[in-house]
């Protein structure tokens, strides 16, 4: 707390202590810390009434533009790095031997629980785009400690098309285009056809765009493929896979790039169905190593898609 003698040192504790005895303990911890930090923030920058009201109006604008499938507050949390930080806190795994699994990153708003199961070797490309570069993606799931292959894991993949839009953003794409679920085989192997990913901009027509512009930051996301891997015995892996030559890796608008998720796409000459090859191997941690072993991924905007219809996120 600020020690500036101009400010009443008893005010913040008074506000925090106003919480009644029926306040749940975890709520008391979170709200007490929030009040303490936001009061300290106001003192530190000597927030003016006009600046405070500008902030209130900005928060109001977040609610006004949000819809059942456009979660602008989620996007604001992304562009200030809060979701990435919460994800890191929730999923940090390091064993006593210093081993760690493949990195987790944010789920993002475009995951769908409705992606269909497909057979290994199938393509998730349902609506071909003339600019899409078909990629044969393959790899092996292994236990991070023993190196043993992990059979029977579900790999859920989704990506934007070559125009930078996901299926439910684009009326020209059918539902579940560039989405699919696969099961690893007895050798822990997985393989399918997808596209080399395409970079795209976050929507800038709302408060997130205003905030990015105010901070003189790019709205671009580097090209990426989303992957979520689940298994009854292992901690869930949610990540995004980035081409190493993408120019936006260092300026990702949601701070989700991690070194072990940056990969090389290579030319493929032995398969008439693909022009690129991507090998991507994954290390998974048993649930006993996970700080939140039974945590589920957050609800995505897409879960309300079928009721709300197609609308720009």
Swiss-Prot record:
Nucleotide-binding is among the record's keywords: no
List of residues binding Fe cation: 166, 200, 224, 226
EC number: 1.13.11.3
Catalytic activity: 3,4-dihydroxybenzoate + O2 = 3-carboxy-cis,cis-muconate + 2 H(+)
UniProt-listed InterPro entries: Catechol_dOase_N, Intradiol_dOase_C, Intradiol_dOase_core, Intradiol_RC_Dioxygenase
Comp. bias (Basic and acidic residues): 304-313
Keywords carried by this UniProt record: Aromatic hydrocarbons catabolism, Dioxygenase, Iron, Metal-binding, Oxidoreductase
UniProt xrefs under Pfam families: Dioxygenase_C (PF00775), Dioxygenase_N (PF04444)
Cofactor binding remark: Binds 1 Fe(3+) ion per subunit.
Spans annotated as Disordered: 287-313
GO terms of molecular function: catechol 1,2-dioxygenase activity; dioxygenase activity; ferric iron binding
Any one of the GO BP annotations: catechol-containing compound metabolic process
Role of this protein: Intradiol ring-cleavage dioxygenase; part of the benzoic acid degradation pathway also known as the protocatechuic acid pathway. Benzoic acid debradation begins with the conversion of benzoic acid into 4-hydroxybenzoic acid through hydroxylation by the benzoate-4-monooxygenase bphA, and its partner NADPH-cytochrome P450 reductase cprA which act as a mediator in electron donation from NADPH. 4-Hydroxybenzoic acid is then converted into 3,4-dihydroxybenzoic acid (also called protocatechuic acid) by the p-hydroxybenzoate-m-hydroxylase phhA.
Self-association and partners: Homodimer.
PANTHER family reported in the protein's UniProt record: DIOXYGENASE, PUTATIVE (AFU_ORTHOLOGUE AFUA_2G02910)-RELATED (PTHR33711), INTRADIOL RING-CLEAVAGE DIOXYGENASE PRCA (PTHR33711:SF5)
Protein family: Belongs to the intradiol ring-cleavage dioxygenase family.
Protein name as catalogued: Intradiol ring-cleavage dioxygenase prcA
Species: Emericella nidulans (strain FGSC A4 / ATCC 38163 / CBS 112.46 / NRRL 194 / M139)
